């Protein structure tokens, strides 16, 4: 089966972005999942690994997970495909963490972080800033200039750290 070149390129781009530490961590996890040591993770091995992590996927869910990253279409996950899968999962976790952090800042739940909410959070985190400093921080991320931080502005701020 021919591999779509754009899918192959996308996977190569993701792998190039990995740090040496991420590659080491992923390789360690891959070797734990690859029970028979043949260099691939089968549906059976993925199922065992997921159950050991407290998940209980159906056979169909396992097949779907493999198919999402199975670049060469052989029904198994090789290390580069595993890296793509792990990086994708990390991105999803990051966005969940950003969403949760936004909820913490947005005390009244109205979808924006006011200067007052931002200041309240900073004080409760033990950070002492003057009114001017808080206003300056908000100005830096307040793209639309409304004096508040909306979700998109917050995501941009958190992503630029």
UniProtKB/Swiss-Prot annotation:
Keywords assigned by UniProt?
Calcium, Metal-binding, Repeat
Q: Residues that bind Ca(2+) 4, according to the entry? A: 142, 144, 146, 148, 153
Keyword S-adenosyl-L-methionine carried by entry = no
Q: Which SUPFAM superfamilies match?
A: EF-hand
Name of the protein described by the UniProt record: Calmodulin-like protein
Q: What is the species listed in this Swiss-Prot or TrEMBL entry?
A: Caenorhabditis elegans
* Statement: the UniProt record of this protein carries the keyword Calcium: yes
Gene Ontology MF terms: calcium ion binding
């Amino acid at each position: 089966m021919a591999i779509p070149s754009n899918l192959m390129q996308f996977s190569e781009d993701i792998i190039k972005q990995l740090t040496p530490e991420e590659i080491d961590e992923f390789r360690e996890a891959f070797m734990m999942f690859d029970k028979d040591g043949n260099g691939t993770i089968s549906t059976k091995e993925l199922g065992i690994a997921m159950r050991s992590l407290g998940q209980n996927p159906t056979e169909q869910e396992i097949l779907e997970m493999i198919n999402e990253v199975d670049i060469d279409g052989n029904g198994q996950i090789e290390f580069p495909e595993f890296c793509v899968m792990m990086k994708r999962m990390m991105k999803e976790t990051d966005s969940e963490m950003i969403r949760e952090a936004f909820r913490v800042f947005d005390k009244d739940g109205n979808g924006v972080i006011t200067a007052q909410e931002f200041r309240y959070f900073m004080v409760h985190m033990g950070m002492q800033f003057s009114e001017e400093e808080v206003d300056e921080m908000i100005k830096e991320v307040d793209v639309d200039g409304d004096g508040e931080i909306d979700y998109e502005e917050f995501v941009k701020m958190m992503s630029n750290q």
